[in-house]
A protein has these predicted regions:
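Short active-site neighborhood of thiol/selenol oxidoreductases, capturing the structured segment around
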Residues: 4-9
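Single conserved hydrophobic/aromatic residue that forms the stacking wall/gate
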Residues: 119-129
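Structural alpha/beta surface segment adjacent to cysteine/selenocysteine redox centers
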Residues: 11, 17-117
């Protein structure tokens, strides 16, 4: 059996959102399943002494342009929340709690969090509470 594609993402990442809308289709076309793995990019950046792209002059402006361009190219609706970046610890915990017993339901949760609460709602909500 072919190993699954491991999809590492952070709910705070617009790139993660865009990838989440396409990863299952891409994997399926190649006979692979997807193992969704949310993680905290902020924690990884902290231990590696890195900054979020949007906080780096010039790079941050380009990242926003790049995200919007990919959104248009793939025809994936995207509204970056005004309170972005966001804390995603609760979202990750909820995903892994559900994934213990039902991976499909956990994926549905991840997609719902991305689509409804973060990037496609006219007024995206804060996930940190």
């Amino acid at each position: 059996m072919t190993a699954p594609v491991e999809f590492f993402f952070d709910f705070a990442s617009p790139y993660g959102y865009l990838a989440s809308e396409r990863i299952e289709g891409i994997a399926s076309r190649h006979g692979r399943s997807v193992l969704w793995r949310p993680f905290l990019v902020g924690a990884a950046m902290k231990v590696s002494d890195r900054k979020p792209l949007v906080s780096i002059p010039l790079i941050g402006d380009y990242a926003i342009h790049d995200i919007e361009r990919f959104s248009r190219y793939w025809n994936i609706p995207l509204t970056v929340p005004s309170h972005w970046p966001i804390a995603t610890v609760a979202a990750c915990r909820a995903f892994y709690l559900i994934a213990r017993t039902d991976q499909a339901a956990a994926i549905q949760l991840a997609q719902a969090l991305y689509r409804c609460l973060l990037y496609t709602s006219p007024s995206p909500r804060d996930l940190s509470t």
